[in-house]
UniProtKB/Swiss-Prot annotation:
NCBIfam families the record matches: CofH family radical SAM protein (TIGR00423), F420_cofH (TIGR03551), PRK07360.1 (NF005609)
Organism, scientific name: Methanococcus maripaludis (strain C7 / ATCC BAA-1331)
Superkingdom: Archaea
Cofactor note: Binds 1 [4Fe-4S] cluster. The cluster is coordinated with 3 cysteines and an exchangeable S-adenosyl-L-methionine.
Name used for this protein in its record: 5-amino-6-(D-ribitylamino)uracil--L-tyrosine 4-hydroxyphenyl transferase
Family: Belongs to the radical SAM superfamily. CofH family.
Pathway stated in the Swiss-Prot or TrEMBL entry: Cofactor biosynthesis; coenzyme F0 biosynthesis
All copies of domain Radical SAM core, residue ranges: 45-282
Biological classification of the source: Archaea, Methanobacteriati, Methanobacteriota, Methanomada group, Methanococci
Record CDD domains: Radical_SAM
Length: 359
């Protein structure tokens, strides 16, 4: 393979697939990705002081990889009202969080106006303590809430932005292929609908992240297709702030008990996903985030030499990975994140949601 040309040019979806299929040049791929990372974003590794707030675990969704959801009436089910969500955001702001990530479930009771009320309450209660970025509601949540409110997606996004939504997590992407989605998340929004929500969010002035969950039933061609879709959206809107690969946690996932499902990705595939993503996106999506919650500290550190340049956040509360079988904790202090970066010879830098460095 011509790795020299791969450094300079925009590689095609076909070449992306060839990189995933290649088993002989693993370290060449890693070396190229790390070189591109250094050229594009330098040696800084960014992180955000943030808190996750899940306002309910009750959900009507049928995602086969989710072990977090509860039914109405379950002993462990909970549902926070907007005031309770706001109090959690205030607690996070008081101890230094610059971002709160707020997500819930899919329920008839949750419409766009309920989401807007959460945003307003959070902004109001935290205002005396300085600005906090609200990073909230997946594309699936936005679509479901809009339907419950009798709104179209554009109308819903306008209301959310006016109510204080700063950015959105680009989750619910999983694998952007409807055949795969019919297996792993049959009632979740279709590929075209996910594209529609995030594209309209960008056009409304709401930046989003983008994600890819791998290591379950997908094949290499699905990975290449997914990355190509994301790059095409970015060319059109420029609205993605980061790409976050999400390795499938199989231990408690209902999906794992079906015949075709793999027991997660190998460590080699984890690192290839980071590396190939960097080679494929180059500077179109500059920031690639590693997930210490899913990979653990050591593999996350290795990924920083495979194309990644962001180590995510402190989180303070992260229940979804934990429920699925994640064993790496739900909180990491700012000092621990810094030490994790320094240990691999890189420079830790605190950022906000928009990737602006906080000195």
């Amino acid at each position: 393979m011509d790795f020299i040309s791969f450094k300079e040019k925009e590689i095609s979806k076909k070449e992306c697939l060839e990189l995933f299929e290649n088993t002989e040049n693993f370290f060449d791929v890693i070396k190229l990705a790390d070189s591109l990372r250094k050229d594009i974003v330098g040696d800084a590794v960014t992180y955000v002081v943030n808190a996750n707030i899940n306002f309910t675990n009750i959900c009507t969704g049928t995602c086969g990889f989710c072990a977090y959801k509860a039914e109405h009436g379950d002993p462990h089910a909970f549902f926070l009202n907007p005031d309770e969500v706001a109090k959690k955001a205030l607690e996070a702001r008081k101890i230094g969080a610059t971002e709160v990530c707020i997500q819930g479930g899919l329920l008839k009771e949750i419409d766009t106006y309920f989401q807007a009320e959460i945003l307003k309450k959070v902004k109001e209660i935290t205002a005396p303590y300085g600005k906090i970025d609200v990073h909230a509601f997946s594309p699936m949540e936005v679509k479901s809430a809009a339907e419950n409110a009798g709104l179209n997606v554009k109308e819903a996004l306008k209301i959310l932005k006016e109510s204080g939504l700063n950015s959105m997590p680009g989750t619910a992407a999983e694998i952007l292929n409807d055949e795969i989605r019919s297996e792993i998340c049959p009632t979740k929004l279709k590929t075209s609908e996910w594209i529609d929500v995030v594209s309209n969010a960008h056009k409304t002035g709401i930046k989003t992240t983008c994600t890819m969950m791998y290591g379950h039933v997908e094949e290499n061609d699905h990975l290449a297709e997914h990355l190509s879709i994301l790059r095409n959206i970015q060319k059109e809107t420029g609205g993605f702030t980061e790409f976050v690969p999400l390795t499938f946690l199989h231990e408690n996932a209902p999906l794992y008990h079906t015949e075709r499902v793999k027991s997660g990705a190998s460590g080699m595939l984890d690192l290839k996903v980071y590396a190939i993503s960097r080679i494929f996106f180059k500077d179109s999506i500059k920031n690639i985030q590693t997930s210490w919650v899913k990979l653990g500290t050591k593999l996350s550190q290795v990924s920083l030499n495979c194309g990644a340049n962001d180590i995510g956040g402190t989180l303070m509360e992260e229940n979804i990975s934990k429920s699925a079988g994640g064993s790496y904790g739900t909180y990491m202090s700012e000092e621990q994140l810094k030490d994790m970066v320094l240990a691999v010879g890189r420079i830790p830098k605190q950022r906000n949601t928009a990737y602006e460095i906080i000195e």
